[in-house]
């Protein structure tokens, strides 16, 4: 595939880099990141450092015109950058191919291994392959959207549960050499969506596609599809079997915000307990009359279709949005209402305790009184948390904020991550 010409980079996108320790999900301050074009890795464009929260400032980077991602084009719609990350006491990390689209803020997660760990001095470079709408990937092998679940001995969950982790087999089903990755469910969905659709598309299109990705994934979880065939993973990264996942992939605020808002949702049909295996294709290189097409969903979003209208256009009128009853790996569930100034009780006390624990590792967060009363100091701490973790700075604990606080609290409280 030809390298993108830098003289076509007439627009700009943004990139923010978040650096954490792989041993524990805590930030790494004072890491330095050198940014260069992937096609010219030795010419450093910019050098940035992480703050006390392990985050860099938002960096403006040249990108191709936004029009390149709005319809199928002969022109690559994103620019590609290499990142070299260094920090005292950690092994260096190199990322090749971070993708930047016009007008969209990308978030690049970086996980570093402590220097004393008994692994090679430098990790293998993380290479981010082409986007599925730009590169060449095998088309999906068609399956029935509802799986038989009455075979003797088959493991099936009794209800739909949002898992804490997905085990991703980074290759085709039968590839014994492919690595398995433990990935938090929300991070997995954000990664897949960033691989499968362009973050510049209309919000309704992004939401419809994210719902299809989540429902497909939860069908694999609910039916224990691969485990029932003797495998030790939840899903593959092969587009022939599942959808694309790329370890280390840049994600985007426009997608991440939606995932944080709707991550417990999936797609249902009447009288069917399991999430529907909603298959899709690009609609240009591959056609799929019974499924959603990604480019087609983009044009429907342009025309003002709502997410459920886009989904019903492709999957039929009987499709509807459902919500999982249970979310794994969190201290307690969303109370069902916002916590704001004037709120009182155990849920407020729990949030105050969790914010104080997070503040031990994220020192820009203030420590607050644990009194079960949601006053100005709690609202300010929530606002600061939202600022650090890319949420709207409202000072109100809404659904996305509740679960983001839970996620970060669990991460910093654990002795070690699964991977």
Q: Predicted regions: what is each one?
A:
Residues 44-46:
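Short loop/turn microsegments at loop-to-beta-strand junctions
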Residues 18-22, 34-36, 86:
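Core beta-strand residues in small-molecule sensory/regulatory alpha/beta domains
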Residues 14-16, 30-32, 80-82:
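Exposed beta-strand and adjacent loop surfaces of beta-rich binding modules
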Residues 1-28, 48:
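Beta-strand-rich domain onsets/edges
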Residues 23, 37-41, 89-91:
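Solvent-exposed strand-loop boundary residues in beta-sheet-rich modules
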Residues 1-3, 9-13, 55-71:
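Charged, amphipathic alpha-helical segments
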Residues 66-89:
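A short, solvent-exposed beta-strand micro-motif common in secreted/extracellular proteins
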Residues 6-8, 30-34, 49, 55-62, ...:
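Conserved, single-site charged/polar hotspot
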């Amino acid at each position: 595939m030809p390298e993108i010409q830098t003289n076509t980079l007439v627009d700009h996108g943004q990139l923010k880099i978040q650096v954490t320790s792989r041993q524990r999900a805590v930030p790494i301050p004072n890491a330095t990141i050198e940014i260069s074009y992937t096609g010219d890795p030795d010419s450093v464009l910019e050098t940035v450092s992480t703050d006390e929260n392990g985050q860099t400032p938002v960096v403006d980077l040249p990108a191709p015109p936004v029009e390149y991602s709005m319809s199928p084009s002969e022109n690559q719609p994103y620019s590609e950058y290499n990142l070299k990350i260094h920090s005292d006491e950690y092994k260096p990390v190199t990322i090749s191919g971070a993708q930047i689209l016009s007008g969209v803020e990308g978030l690049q997660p970086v996980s570093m291994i402590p220097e004393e760990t008994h692994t090679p001095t430098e990790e293998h470079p993380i290479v981010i392959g082409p986007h599925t709408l730009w590169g060449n990937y095998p088309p999906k092998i068609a399956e029935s959207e509802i799986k038989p679940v009455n075979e003797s001995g088959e493991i099936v969950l009794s209800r739909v549960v949002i898992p804490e982790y997905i085990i991703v087999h980074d290759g085709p089903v039968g590839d014994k050499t492919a690595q398995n990755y433990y990935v938090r469910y929300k991070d997995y969905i954000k990664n897949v969506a960033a691989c499968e659709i362009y973050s510049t598309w209309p919000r309704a299109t992004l939401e419809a596609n994210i719902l299809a990705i989540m429902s497909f994934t939860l069908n694999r979880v609910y039916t224990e599809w691969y485990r029932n065939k003797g495998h030790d993973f939840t899903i593959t990264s092969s587009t022939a079997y599942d959808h694309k996942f790329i370890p280390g992939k840049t994600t985007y605020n426009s997608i991440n915000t939606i995932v944080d808002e709707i991550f417990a949702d999936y797609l249902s049909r009447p009288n069917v307990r399991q999430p529907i295996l909603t298959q899709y294709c690009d609609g240009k290189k591959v056609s799929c009359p019974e499924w959603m097409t990604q480019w087609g969903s983009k044009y429907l979003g342009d025309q003002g279709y709502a997410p459920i209208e886009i989904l019903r256009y492709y999957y039929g009128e009987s499709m509807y949005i459902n919500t999982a009853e249970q979310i794994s790996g969190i201290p307690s569930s969303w109370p069902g209402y916002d916590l704001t100034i004037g709120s009182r009780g155990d849920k407020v006390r729990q949030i105050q305790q969790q914010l104080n624990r997070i503040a031990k590792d994220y020192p820009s967060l203030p420590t607050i009184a644990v009194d079960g009363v949601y006053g100005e100091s709690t609202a300010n701490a929530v606002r600061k948390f939202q600022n650090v973790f890319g949420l709207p700075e409202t000072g109100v604990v809404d659904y996305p904020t509740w679960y983001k606080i839970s996620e970060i609290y669990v991460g910093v409280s654990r002795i070690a991550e699964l991977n």
